[in-house]
A protein has these predicted regions:
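Alpha-helical cap/lid subdomain in secreted, periplasmic
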Residues: 256-403, 407-414
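Short glycine/proline-centered coil/turn motifs in the loop regions
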Residues: 105, 456-459, 494
Length: 531
């Protein structure tokens, strides 16, 4: 519920705000050494707004779009440049009710009122008539920047709006504390909720409830306050969780697309806001996502400000590390540099920090090597319809990986905030050998495969399958499976008599082997016995 929290401030007097002129007269550098250069802004201060007199405003808008690199649409640089008069006021990053009156239009014109780069109001200005509008702006930084421009017409960048700002006042809006604890997640693909057809890919945001709800059960609905189809709200015996994580987003694109604005419009005092970015910002060939390292700190600080100024509580979270094969030391990379910025901001600002990056490094060192292939999207061919040829993804998480990170986040929350309780699963001390393990020949388009299946163990996190020569025990391959089935394609050079050894795993605990053998008929495969 919104409430007014004080007297309205007139931004046209008292020196609270200032007027500036902005333009983008020169073309950007474009692609230079793998980084796209946009047009540079030229800004001249007009005056401080002292006496309350009307402000003459001009406005013009034009858009530009680059060509894609190598046909990749994600490399397209798009920019909307708004030129003319801007009113700028330094204000707390909270919710403000804005009242603005415009007049002095020279002709009837359809215009857009823009605040902090996001269009807020469309209206028609007419000669000899004043137009007053009121609206609420959830500021996502400690600054309000307002301009008015013509509604953009394709191919027409020459139209210049001339109008008069006769009144501009703001009044702080407060929100009541929510009836029950709430957690908002602003993050990227490693947190996002995924659909069933995208499995086994998963995000930790969709598993957080598992560790925060006493019965590990949640009612899951689409978050109707978000326009992203992946957004979900989790309701159960614990804090309500709004997972607004979305793939391919950085601090920049999350804000530019209005997603931070949408989230902040729902945040109330006392809410916890989890903020995890630092991956897509490093993509120099993705201009809409990229944030140079030397600019990243100010973006993180803006997010922290926008939560703190609402009397809500931010918690910064580092990204999980990239996949590295067992036995190798993970080299220092650019992701670490961005993570370090978030760690420093958290320390300097005194806000909570969950260093998933460090926690995951420690966890992986303690786990058997094959756990890495179960945590990351390292999929063998023919196992999942969404990835028929397999996948070797060093960033994104499986259901097991996402659940593992969710546990780290939940325990970090409990250590940082009163009233948060973690309901961890019992430690598995023993696993039985998988039951009903069988191997059957399965004909496929280009030959034959062996279909393996077994009874699922709810305590197991993943399974390891070792394929070997039934006579000599020579190991041909070792696979990891997240589900109680596996389709194995014959390998050149393997014997036709195959033995499969299956073990179930939970952390460092493994079961005894379950064995299954199969003999492939000679007419089914071009395999040559090399043993």
């Amino acid at each position: 519920m919104l409430e007014l929290a004080g007297d309205a401030q007139n931004l046209l007097c008292g020196g609270v705000a200032r007027a500036v002129k902005r333009d983008y007269p020169n073309e950007g550098s474009g692609w230079v050494e793998g980084v796209y250069g946009f047009r540079a802004m030229v800004e001249d201060e007009v005056r401080a707004l002292e006496d309350g007199s009307p402000l003459s405003m001009t406005g013009r808008v034009f858009a530009e779009e680059s060509q894609p690199l190598d046909g990749d649409a994600n490399t397209i640089a798009r920019a909307t440049y708004r030129c003319g008069t801007f009113v700028i006021a330094d204000l707390p990053a909270c919710d403000w009710r804005v009242r603005a009156t415009f007049g002095g239009a020279r002709r009837e014109e359809r215009v857009e009122l823009v605040v902090n780069d996001l269009p807020r109001i469309r209206m028609t200005l007419r000669p000899d008539t004043s137009k007053t509008v009121e609206f609420v702006v959830p500021l996502d930084r400690r600054r309000l920047e307002l301009c008015v421009v013509p509604v953009e017409m394709p191919g027409d960048s020459s139209r210049v709006l001339r109008a008069e700002l006769q009144e501009l006042s703001v009044e702080r809006v407060s929100r009541q504390r929510a009836a029950r604890p709430r957690i908002f997640v602003a993050a990227d693909s490693t947190s996002q909720t995924y659909f069933d057809y995208e499995r086994p890919q998963s995000g930790w945001g969709e598993w957080l409830y598992w560790f925060l709800y006493s019965d590990h059960a949640a009612k899951v609905d689409h978050d109707i306050t978000s326009d992203a189809k992946q957004s979900r709200v989790f309701i159960g015996n614990g804090p309500t969780i709004f997972n607004r994580g979305l793939g391919g987003r950085s601090l920049k694109s999350y804000r530019d697309e209005g997603r931070l604005d949408s989230l902040l419009s729902q945040v109330c005092p006392g809410d916890i806001c989890l903020i995890q970015f630092g991956c897509n910002e490093t993509s120099t060939n993705r201009p809409m996502r990229y944030i140079p390292l030397d600019e990243y700190r100010s973006w993180v600080e803006d997010y922290v400000d926008s939560v703190c100024d609402r009397d809500a509580v931010p918690c910064l979270i580092t990204e999980s590390p990239l996949y590295v094969e067992a036995g190798r030391t993970r080299p220092h990379g650019v992701f670490d540099d961005y993570a370090q910025v978030a760690i420093e901001v958290a320390r300097e600002r005194g806000v909570a920090m969950i260093d998933v990056r460090a926690l995951m490094d420690q966890y992986l060192l303690a786990m058997p090597g094959q756990a890495r292939d179960a945590i990351y999207m390292r999929l063998e061919p023919m196992q999942y319809a969404c990835h028929p040829t397999g996948l070797k993804d060093p960033i994104h998480l499986t259901t097991f990986g996402a659940k593992t990170v969710a546990g780290m986040v939940a325990r970090g929350l409990a250590a940082s905030f009163n009233g948060i309780q973690v309901y961890d699963e019992p430690v598995v001390e023993r696993l039985d050998a998988p039951a009903q393990f069988c191997a059957l020949i399965d004909r496929i388009v280009s030959g034959a495969a062996v279909a393996l299946s077994w009874q699922a163990d709810p305590r197991a996190q993943y399974y390891v399958i070792e394929k070997r020569n039934a006579q000599t025990k020579r190991v041909y391959a070792r696979y990891v499976s997240l589900k109680p089935e596996f389709l194995d394609r014959m390998l050149p050079g393997q014997n036709r008599d195959i033995e499969y050894a299956l073990t179930a795993w939970a952390d460092t605990v493994s079961s005894a082997e379950a064995l299954a053998t199969v003999t492939l008929p000679s007419s089914d495969s071009p395999c040559i016995d090399m043993d």
